[in-house]
């Protein structure tokens, strides 16, 4: 077993001009995933993956950094414009969208795809702090 080579999978450059940026903003974290129009993942990032811990993950600044990291990675694959699909009630929604625009990606549309129940299951009880 000595001298065995491990081969790492080479990153393939996907040539994708436009795609969809899915921003999932929860009360605890913000996830940004950039896909092609069919839904195949090209790049992703989150506040936790960037090293933010605990309550710092839920800040708008952490969401901004996550969106910036995902946008830079997707631009290496040739991405130029994105539609934005925002989901969730978190504080990082607007910051992530602004960050995508600031990195040089053209935002063509913004959709809110937050799931709204038609009176489904009972929600968790209200916090008393």
From Swiss-Prot:
Disulfide bonds: none annotated. Belongs to the universal ribosomal protein uS11 family. The keyword Electron transport does not apply. It comes from Lacticaseibacillus paracasei (strain ATCC 334 / BCRC 17002 / CCUG 31169 / CIP 107868 / KCTC 3260 / NRRL B-441). One of its GO terms (biological process) is translation. Pfam families: Ribosomal_S11. It comes from the Bacteria. Keywords: Ribonucleoprotein, Ribosomal protein, RNA-binding, rRNA-binding. Part of the 30S ribosomal subunit. Interacts with proteins S7 and S18. Binds to IF-3. Coiled coil: none annotated. GO terms for cellular component: ribonucleoprotein complex; ribosome. Located on the platform of the 30S subunit, it bridges several disparate RNA helices of the 16S rRNA. Forms part of the Shine-Dalgarno cleft in the 70S ribosome. This is Small ribosomal subunit protein uS11. GO terms for molecular function: rRNA binding; structural constituent of ribosome. InterPro entries: Ribosomal_uS11, Ribosomal_uS11_bac-type, Ribosomal_uS11_CS, Ribosomal_uS11_sf. The lineage of its organism: Bacteria, Bacillati, Bacillota, Bacilli, Lactobacillales.
